[in-house]
């Protein structure tokens, strides 16, 4: 498993757990958004510059 995928999944899991305990939807939405942004940006950078 690639490290950026692992970081995105852990961040997503963390935001879900925080949502379960706080019932704050804003934390859940921001966590999902950040996880998706990290995954997409790092994947693009990794594929474009590392795998040439």
From Swiss-Prot:
Function in brief: Part of the Ced system, which is involved in DNA import.
Oligomer status and interactors: Forms a complex composed of CedA, CedA1 and CedA2.
Domain of life according to the entry: Archaea
Record-given protein name: DNA import protein CedA2
Localisation per UniProt entry: Cell membrane
Gene it is expressed from: cedA2
Transmembrane segments: 1-21, 27-47
GO cellular component: plasma membrane
Chief place of localization: membrane
Keywords, ordered alphabetically: Cell membrane, Membrane, Transmembrane, Transmembrane helix, Transport
Membrane association type: Multi-pass membrane protein
Description of what induces expression: Up-regulated upon UV stress.
């Amino acid at each position: 498993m690639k490290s950026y995928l692992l970081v995105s999944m852990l961040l997503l899991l963390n935001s879900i757990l925080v949502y379960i305990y706080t019932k704050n939807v804003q934390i859940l939405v921001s966590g999902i958004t950040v996880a998706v942004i990290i995954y997409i940006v790092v994947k693009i950078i990794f594929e474009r510059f590392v795998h040439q």
